[in-house]
Amino acid sequence: TSNMAMPFALSIAVSTVIIEVLLGVMLLIGFKRKFTVWALLLMIVFFTFLTFYSAYFNKVTDCGCFGDAIPLTPWQSFSKDIVLLVMILILLVNIKVIKPLFSDKINSIIVGIALLLCIFMGYWVLNHLPLKDFRAYSSGTNIPKGMEIPEDAPKSVVEMIFVYNVNGTNTEFTDKQLMDIPAGAAFVSREDKVITQGYVPQIHDFSIEKDGFDYTEEMLSEPKLMMLISYDLALANKNGLAMLEKLHQEAKVKGYKVIGMTASADEEISAVKKEFKLSFDYYFCDATTLKTIERANPSIIILNNGVIGQKVHYNDINKLKL
């Protein structure tokens, strides 16, 4: 069922955000108060359940409510939803107090303008870079510096957990309980459980690898480096890929070292290079990290000695300044 819904995930996400914004605007101007408050109540009940489920069962490690602008843990997000639920219930009880600020005609125009702005913003962020980048790889970021861990930084405390099948039930044992494992129990797996999270640098899981070798330090020392990023080449925009070789040749003339960055397998890389006649080499990096750098697929990043200078969506390649 989840796989069937995947093609619609982006549309559902964008639509949900637009609905939330419109309901917020409608509440502020007192437009269609009964519909607005009841819709807000239904929405917050759903999200309160969702955030509790995510937090309790540890389905996600951070909340996407405000993205990287205001990072929240799942439990913080659940607490936020509880507060909003209480506030909306207060609005429901006092719904008659809500009065429209303007006439229905003017209120309708305001909501219509808000809808158009939401649609425009949705279109913009899907076809260009965000107007404001709150992520760890925004322009001006020094990647090597962002990866540094201070000497006095707190270390993570990790406990080894051994899972054994005991009489048909998977049972966890710590390394101090190994002597208590019953005879005949079958080993299932070993896991590392984080007891206390240590210092996590702003930039982590970033690497540039090829054929088992790590080229991160070497590449981040390049005075003029162009990275052509596609977290998944199978999902990359064909028109975007078709522009890369011309850009590669133009950048080489200007003295840039040009590399591709992807999490795709070698077979996929070879097929794409052959189809689009790409002559630069692809290096491996974690897919989540590449999506954090830039979700456009492909996207272009310019670095100068490890400092991000320019970032462009494939639709804006002509705006790149070499």
Sequence positions of predicted segments:
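Functionalized membrane-embedded alpha-helices
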Residues: 9-50, 91
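Short loop/turn motifs at secondary-structure junctions and domain boundaries
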Residues: 10, 154, 198, 290-294
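Membrane-interface helix-boundary motifs at transmembrane edges
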Residues: 29-38, 96-107
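Membrane-embedded alpha-helical segments of integral membrane proteins
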Residues: 45-98
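Internal/C-terminal transmembrane anchor helices
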Residues: 102-131
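Membrane-interface segments at or immediately adjacent to transmembrane helices
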Residues: 121-216
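Solvent-exposed soluble domains appended to multi-pass membrane proteins
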Residues: 209, 216-322
